[in-house]
Amino acid sequence: MKILIKYKNIYYTLILIAASLFFPLFYGHKGILPIDSFLIFNGGYNIFNGYYPFKDYWSITGPLLDYIQYFFFIIGKLSWISYVAHAAVFNLILCLFSFYFFLKIELKKEYSFLYALGISILGYGQTGTPFMDQHAFIFSYLSIGFLLLGIKFKKNQYWFFSSFLLIFSFFSKQIPSSYLAIFLFFFSFVYLFFYKKKFANILSFYIGGIFSLFIFATIFVLNKIPFGNFFTQYILYPLTIGDDRFERLSLSINNTVLQFKFLYLAIIPYLAIFYRSRTRK
């Protein structure tokens, strides 16, 4: 029993590794969506055959996923298991980061484990194959996580990785990283106003973003991808899609409340726990 307590984190980590790999690998072989499930597969296949996004084929989705899938095809050959493994690895990253993030902010080990286990199921378990929405969320999630650690511990490396991964999120999908980048831009000035001696934190944040942009700019230059093509396909054209969706947006009770009633109900226990903990203090 003493050994179990001593190595509890190791046991929890091994269980989380197994769970986060199992769910995408299992459900990735259970079914497909005719278009969405093959989108990143085709992108990785194109690069595998010497074609590049924006230059040789039209792309309005994140080019980063195509390149990552290309590397998975190199490592595991051109196969479906290499495709599903892509999703499984990112599910693993999401799960383990969550676990150690919760531990870092001093959440109980048992709670940290259970929350991370739930994340391993909800992460890539729902699709089983790589998709830009999941990747964009994961990178943004990691970015926010590192930012919170940076604020709590005042360490420059956390600030650096926050913006670094935010750029990765943008090149996975334009949102939510664009909204998050705007918010963090203004937040950095507010933070600097209250913590004038922590200029190195903000400097690290911007250096991380610039370094990340430099990596993607280098890829574009090496592959001779025209910037005009990228701007048209990845920035301008998606804006037209957004305009159309915004015009059809309905703010009815059904769309804003009833469709999300179970999410609202799930929040109630957490609010009750939060209220009780505050009253005890």
What kind of region is each of these model predictions?
Residues 85-107, 142:
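Transmembrane-helix motifs of polytopic, lipid-linked glycan transferases
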Residues 11-20, 196-222, 259-268:
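Hydrophobic alpha-helical membrane-interfacial segments at the cytosolic entry of transmembrane helices
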Residues 28-43, 53-71, 77-81, 224-227:
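Extracytoplasmic catalytic/substrate-binding loops of multi-pass membrane glycan-assembly enzymes
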Residues 128-137:
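Short acidic/glycine- and proline-prone juxtamembrane loop motifs at membrane-interface regions
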Residues 2, 179-212, 229, 278:
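Perimembrane helix-loop-helix junctions
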Residues 104-106, 141-160, 169, 195-197, ...:
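Membrane-interface transmembrane helices that cradle and orient dolichyl/undecaprenyl
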Residues 120, 124, 158-176, 180-185:
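Membrane-interface alpha helices of multi-pass inner-membrane proteins
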Residues 98-122, 156-157:
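Transmembrane-helix signature of polytopic, membrane-embedded enzymes
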